[in-house]
Amino acid sequence: MGPSSLLHPAFASSAGPTRRTIDLADCRERLVRHRIYGLVNSAPRLRRFMESHVFAVWDFQSLLKAMQQRLTCTSLPWVPTLDPEARRLVNEIVLDEESDELPEGGSASHFELYLDGMRAAGADTGPIDGMIEALQAGRLPQVEQPAATVGEVVAEAMRASGAPNAARDFVQKSFAVIESGSTHGIVAAFTYGREDVIPDMFRSLVSSLASRDTAWARFHWYLERHIEADDEKHAPVCRRIMARLCGDDPAKWAEASRVARECIEARIALWDAIAADIETMPAG
């Protein structure tokens, strides 16, 4: 991948010949070349990786739903939102991410696919299952509901379930963006902090898994599916939404750039922590 591919032009189709770029080449390069990918070289190490990374997979779905809430009408009574094109684009992404078609038939979210991959590989799903169960049941005695923010509720659920500290920090960054009230900030986090970088990150993991046991087949399919969907479809769509939101407003583009950079740095910090943990384990 050449340096020019790290700069993504965005065109605001509703605002004339506006052209904007968000330059994330330096931090993006550090992310896609992180040492974590070379360290995931054995079954125990991959299981350890998955046990932390699964929280980022869940976090992805939460960012997507925040984006959908901002760009479409998800409450009653229904009313049309301002940008029908953005509405259609985000709903297309939700369809794929929340209810993708499975190779054997049926549908599942990519989060559920990841959990299936973890179980098939023998990874511990206890903490992530505990977090989801706590959120579903509202069993969070340390949180004063309904006064608590969504981020506070999630933080307590993660703490109570024993989620790794680095995963908790990563998720809290995302919910800080969600609760900021900035639609273009949320879309920037999802576009440049998720969809735009995930294909290159996952390609490195796919290479590491190429000769692994069939127990990783489900996880391998999840990675391949994300690479295909994000690289060819979702990332370009997200950049179109980004352009429509920011238009020709330099302040919005500056904020989007700041949020995108902070999200990539948060991912690097998560990778640093997981790598440090994995390095205490025997090499593959």
Identify the meaning behind each predicted range.
Residues 2-284:
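Non-heme di-metal
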